[in-house]
Swiss-Prot record:
DCTP binds at R117, S118, S119, F120, G121, R122, D135, T143, L144, E145, Q163, Y177, K184, Q188. It is an enzyme of class 3 (hydrolase). It comes from Methanococcus maripaludis (strain C7 / ATCC BAA-1331). The keyword Hydrolase applies. Its EC number is 3.5.4.30. This is dCTP deaminase, dUMP-forming. Belongs to the dCTP deaminase family.
Length: 206
């Protein structure tokens, strides 16, 4: 059962669902809009070896970031010209990780799904790849996987980037996501790189 606007207000007001900060203007007919935070991660690897920790740069923006397609030519001159013309803090090409401003806590009988905004789809910008699912019992901020597929796109801190759709399960989970022993991203309060290498460590323990 998907929660409607009335349900979302009810769950938030009764503290069954926590969204912090919460803005009543961001409640849609059956979704809640979330906004872009200031922290990002850009991987440094030429090849992703998923059995190893992935080296990366973590950085913050004050106002805006330009995201370019992977094959978009950038050199120092172009970067400086872009910064001067568009007044952006940072310019990157290829994919990067971001995070929402919103911290979310779900009970064991509510799960959620993140979807990018249709307006972003119309400029060929994707803000999640395969990681839109949020298990019941999750506590933390939502990670964004950001890729521009056509032309460079300028994103602004605090702008709405997507929405959460909440669903109520038939019965509560015995153990919610953040209480599971092997949950890798429980309680995340800033952008986090992939911890998939821990899957192999877990498999070796079993």
């Amino acid at each position: 059962m998907i929660l409607s606007d009335k349900d979302i207000f009810d769950y938030v007001n009764s503290k069954r669902v926590l969204i912090e900060p919460f803005n009543s203007k961001f409640v849609g007919p059956c979704s809640y809009d979330v906004t872009l935070g200031s922290e990002f991660i850009k991987y440094k690897e030429d090849v992703y070896d998923l059995k190893k920790s992935l080296s990366h740069n973590k950085f913050e923006i004050e106002n805006s970031i330009m995201v370019c397609p992977l094959n978009h030519h950038l050199d120092e001159t172009i970067i400086e010209n872009y910064k001067e013309k568009y007044n952006v803090d940072c310019i990157v090409s290829g994919g990067l990780l971001g995070t929402t401003n919103e911290y979310v806590e779900l009970p064991n009988d509510v799960c959620a799904q993140y979807q990018g905004r249709s307006s972003f789809g119309r400029v060929f910008l994707q803000t999640h790849q395969t990681a839109g699912w949020i298990d019941s019992g999750f506590r933390g901020k939502i990670t964004l996987e950001i890729v521009a597929y056509d032309k460079p796109v300028i994103l602004y801190k605090n702008q709405r980037v997507g929405q959460l759709i909440f669903s109520k399960s038939l019965s509560p989970a015995d153990v919610g996501y953040s209480d599971r022993k092997y949950s890798k991203y429980a309680g995340q309060k800033s952008v986090m790189a992939s911890l998939i290498k821990k899957d192999f460590e877990i498999d070796e323990e079993e």
